[in-house]
Amino acid sequence: MTKSLPKDFIFGGATAAYQAEGATHTDGKGPVAWDKYLEDNYWYTAEPASDFYHKYPVDLKLAEEYGVNGIRISIAWSRIFPTGYGEVNPKGVEFYHNLFAECHKRHVEPFVTLHHFDTPEALHSNGDFLNRDNIEHFVDYAAFCFEEFPEVRYWTTFNEIGPIGDGQYLVGKFPPGIQYDLAKVFQSHHNMMVSHARAVKLYKDKGYKGEIGVVHALPTKYPYDPENPADVRAAELEDIIHNKFILDATYLGHYSDVTLAGVNHILKVNGGQLDLRDEDFAALEAAKDLNDFLGINYYMSDWMRDFDGETEIIHNGKGEKGSSKYQIKGVGRRESPTHIPKTDWDWIIYPQGLYDQIMRIKKDYPNYKKIYITENGLGYKDEFVDNTVYDDARIDYVKQHLEVLSDAIADGANVKGYFIWSLMDVFSWSNGYEKRYGLFYVDFETQERYPKKSAHWYRRLAETQMIE
């Protein structure tokens, strides 16, 4: 049976400032930690990326032509405040006014994120969100943007608080490249959630007319053997690290006893302690019912096995299938069932995980109000032939996830939109330019755009709301 989506559904495309804009030092933009980190550690940089800084009229025209009626955009904090605070860069402000005006001209609703992995270097080198001073700087930056850009009706504070802490302090593939420091992971999560809560409260106190929420990456965690209590425990602990800790902060305003017990166990085994203050919980409590929506980024699920050994994580950044490894002392190790497909980057393709995660939110956090799927898509080594890409695998991936999304809506979840990652091909943080996600192929040499087969399929989807 062909499944469908609601008439008022947003069919969106997602981007991010640093991954799309290029122009990393143009018109007064301040540096971010990624600039030097990529030069020192990787075989690529974010220059020129998709040159969205200059090409956004082209991309938004394509969006309109292909039925995309929403776009995720992030503001580069260091375009507005080159050092993260203090003097405003007027050219950065002007750019975003022009960008949002073009969105509305093209009838593509902008969903705007304040922070997408790109803290200004001056603040990042001073501890990023481990430094509580940067909570204040973020709230000041948010306050400026809320006041300056009334044309924005949908705001999100952060993109993927979980993967920021993981990337910076656990896997070590984000600057500053620290590995296996679980205390820093949790402290980063916590301080960013406090920053989120304070920005949301400020937005509501000021009486702005739009909506505000947060985008969380929520990979669903399963026990490898559901009959084995040790595997079940491993999945629970892994879920606390990546999902439950930040969801509790978002919607409970505190950490449940189960969550705190799990965190304390992990830190007892791995070392470290957290700085959790009364004023932090006052901020979380004040904002827990003020979020207008939750953005869910979902790409994959994980299966966990019991593990008794030392932490070791190997990141598959080059698309060499089977080269990744993930095991955490006192938590567990990832091992996927052999019958479940995965990408060349070892990302497990499991649409049911999206359904399960949505229904988990509905059950455990009933004050969620509404959900947007703010990222979902297939990274692939696209083959450019005849001025297009015949990306049937991407179409199949998106179709399967939209079908379970339709099921979740039928089962009572309030899901209002879907943003494919990504609108056009962009640069990937730890994979460079080989891993493509876009509806539109970007020739990174010429910056020409070419619709892929998936773009034509997505247009039909948006026109009919039928998942075919």
Swiss-Prot record:
Q: Which UniProt keywords apply?
A: Glycosidase, Hydrolase
Active site at E160, E375
Q: Domain of life, per the record?
A: Bacteria
One example of the protein's molecular function in GO is: beta-glucosidase activity
Catalytic activity annotated for this protein?
Answer: a 6-phospho-beta-D-galactoside + H2O = D-galactose 6-phosphate + an alcohol
Tagged with keyword Ribosomal protein: no
HAMAP family membership: LacG (MF_01574)
What protein family is recorded?
Answer: Belongs to the glycosyl hydrolase 1 family.
Protein name (record): 6-phospho-beta-galactosidase
Recorded source organism is Streptococcus gordonii (strain Challis / ATCC 35105 / BCRC 15272 / CH1 / DL1 / V288)
